[in-house]
Amino acid sequence: HPQAQRTIRRVFRKIAEGGDQVVFSTHSSLLVDVAYFDEIIRMESKCEIVNGKRTAVSKAWQLPMARMIDDLETRFPNLKGKVMPESMRDRYSHAYNPRRNEGFFASKIILVEGLTEEYSLPIYADALPNCTFDPQGISVVECGGKGSMDRLFRIFNELHIPCYILFDYDSGNSDANIINKSKELLALAGESQDTPQTLFVADCIACFLKKWESDLKGEIPDADTLAGEARKELGLSVDSGKPLIARYIARKLIERTPPQVPPSLKTIIEKAVAVKWNKTCLKAKADASVADVSE
């Protein structure tokens, strides 16, 4: 039961705060907390050829708190010596969410801004060859907005989980902070910070020039008609239910013969399914955070 799992998590935390070490293994997203990323050890096992023999090789990935603090202070020199473990946890405390925590157990992650993408992408993926997410261990993680995407990317990436970032660039937005965040995400992925002129798709990141809805509208000729049907069937007002409308449209499109997946989303999904882990994204100096065990 979810309530029991949350209770167990609190009990474990209380025991640990009393000075005893608690070690447990889990596949439950309710028993991990992104704010305590440094206490999570991610185990990965693969079959590899070692000395000519097929061997099970296990790796244990962990992200030390010191590396995250060093990274933050390197990026913001004015914080040098001021970042404590408690304040670092505060930066991530809002992110505790079983759906987001699911990323710790994924083989690959697609980081998205909100529910529109979380609801719709899996539906479109099901209509593409070899792209269904669940059988491949791929999770779509909504970040609660563009502002938190870089933080979650750093955690998941440093645990060696391949991540694909999808966001709205919001070109034309008068809020400089929003545009700066878009540029920051592109830089984080090693891409140019120049404003894209159209849909931008790379090996580990993609962004719509303005927004999901407006950019895809040209690829869905009857988008307005479908949106109207969704509002009528779901009882939504004109300015509400954006994620539900997007999901409705996705379902209607793939029910057609043949299924209709907007070309932009087809390209993005195929890139996301193929994403591979590249390198650390931290500015901090790397240290020992991985152990190899051959069995």
Sequence positions of predicted segments:
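Switch/communication elements of ASCE P-loop NTPase nucleotide-binding domains
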Residues: 1-86, 90-98, 274, 278, ...
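Acidic, Mg2+-coordinating catalytic modules of nucleic-acid enzymes
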Residues: 73-111, 115-295
